[in-house]
């Protein structure tokens, strides 16, 4: 490959020679960068009145004295002479050029198209470099190299930006430690859930009537199985919240409102991060593995689809315990729940968690582009799941006998706004 290709985004090299006929040296090293104008893109720039910074106003072409547009093949020339010189070399036309007047033509803006030989000779005389005109293969190779260099610089800038993003302070690390421990101590089966889960028998929750598109019946056998694990699942969410220092400082009334508002969201998150693509199941409360239709027919309806879809999308995020814990803390401290007293204090608490969360994400350095905003979108998804479940709960109350509802289940979800 031509050594002139290496590492350049421009189309020519600097030249320190003086111009013939008393022309001065190029003004500065900016000429290298600006010579990228030699491509077709220069036409659109010129039509917009673009003038390179190294040219003086109305600076003439050193070949024909027309208005120069830039530094082309080591000389300041107009677009016409640049194109003429390039075509001549690329198509090897100069051996066929001839002159009717013994090679003595004066080349200017008016006469430049009348004698190709004298125009080409003047191009050479003023210093235009034949070796800088690339053939097709070299031009393709150069364009490829330019793109590779741009991509390399883009990645370097991205890495530099990531390295400059703040990581958790010592106070934030302590908060992160407390939140993570609160999650681990209240998350059933921990990292061993796959080994300890039990699959709900396939004949449960597969009621043909409940599965019919036009039917919204609840499979009572499946619903009964789910209610067996709902009380300990809710209790673990309450225990998680109580372990967070900022939560315990809130009035009791606000604590209750926050817990009722986030309970389904946190339980859904804990189930979603235990989505198993191989068996296409979610593991509820760390122990019961269920399929989509079983959860749907067991009372959740379309909410089941939302939780399974969330689980499938979250599997690409590869969240660790700390990220799941901080997501739960953000969901818990939602200041827009109806009836709260200390909304400002709760909002500041959530901001504290969010900032520590963002800094922790910076520390983790995930490979997914825009990881942080994409993860925050999952908070919105979980809030939607909570809202849909509040509506779905009313349907369950109609379809299912009251005696099947555990007291804590009723206490948490019965008075929620729809």
UniProtKB/Swiss-Prot annotation:
Tissue: Highest level of expression in erythrocytes. Also expressed in liver, tail, eye, muscle and skin.
The keyword Metal-binding is annotated on this UniProt entry: yes
Chief location of this protein within or outside the cell: nucleus
Residue ranges annotated for the NR LBD domain, each copy included: 171-415
Taxonomic lineage from the root: Eukaryota, Metazoa, Chordata, Craniata, Vertebrata
Molecular function GO terms recorded: nuclear receptor activity; RNA polymerase II cis-regulatory region sequence-specific DNA binding; thyroid hormone binding; zinc ion binding
Protein name per its UniProtKB record: Thyroid hormone receptor alpha
Sequence segments annotated as region (Modulating): 1-60
Zn finger spans (NR C4-type): 61-81, 99-123
Binding positions (Zn(2+) 2): 99, 105, 115, 118
Subcellular location: Nucleus
DNA-binding annotation, residue ranges on this chain: 61-135
């Amino acid at each position: 490959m031509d050594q002139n290709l290496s590492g350049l985004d421009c189309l020519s090299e600097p030249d320190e020679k003086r111009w013939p006929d008393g022309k001065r040296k190029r003004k500065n090293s900016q000429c290298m960068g600006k010579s990228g104008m030699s491509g077709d893109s220069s036409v659109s720039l010129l039509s917009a009145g673009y003038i390179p910074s190294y040219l003086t106003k109305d600076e003439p072409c050193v070949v024909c004295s027309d208005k120069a547009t830039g530094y082309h093949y080591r000389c300041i020339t107009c677009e016409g002479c640049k194109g003429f010189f390039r075509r001549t070399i690329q198509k090897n036309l100069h051996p066929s050029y001839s002159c009717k007047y013994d090679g003595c033509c004066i080349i200017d803006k008016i006469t430049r198209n009348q004698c190709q030989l004298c125009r080409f000779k003047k191009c050479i005389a003023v210093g235009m470099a034949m070796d800088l005109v690339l053939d097709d293969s070299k031009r393709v190779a150069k364009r490829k190299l330019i793109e590779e260099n741009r991509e390399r610089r883009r990645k370097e800038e991205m890495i530099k930006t990531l390295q400059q993003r703040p990581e958790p302070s010592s106070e934030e690390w302590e908060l992160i430690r407390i939140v993570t421990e609160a999650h681990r101590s209240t998350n059933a089966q921990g990292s061993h859930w796959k080994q300890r889960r039990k699959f709900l028998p396939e004949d449960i929750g597969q009621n043909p009537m409940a599965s019919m598109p036009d039917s919204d019946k609840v499979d009572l056998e499946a619903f009964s199985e789910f209610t067996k694990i709902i009380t300990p699942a809710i209790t673990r969410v309450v225990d998680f919240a109580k372990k967070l220092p900022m939560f315990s400082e809130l009035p009791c009334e606000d604590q209750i409102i926050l817990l009722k508002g986030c309970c389904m969201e946190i339980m859904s998150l804990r189930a979603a991060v235990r989505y198993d693509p191989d068996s296409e199941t979610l593991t509820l409360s760390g122990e019961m593995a269920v399929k989509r239709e079983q959860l749907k027919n067991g009372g959740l309806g379309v909410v089941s689809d939302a939780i399974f879809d969330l689980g499938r999308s979250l599997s690409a995020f590869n969240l660790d315990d700390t990220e799941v814990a901080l997501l739960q803390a953000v969901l818990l401290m939602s200041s827009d729940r109806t009836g709260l007293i200390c909304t400002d204090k709760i909002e500041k608490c959530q901001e504290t968690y969010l900032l520590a969360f963002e800094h922790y994400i910076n520390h983790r350095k995930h490979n997914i582009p825009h990881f942080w905003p994409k993860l925050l979108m999952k908070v919105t998804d979980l809030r939607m799941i909570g809202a849909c479940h509040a509506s779905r709960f009313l349907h369950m109350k109609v379809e299912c006998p009251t005696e099947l509802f555990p007291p804590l289940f009723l206490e948490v979800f019965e008075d929620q706004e729809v």
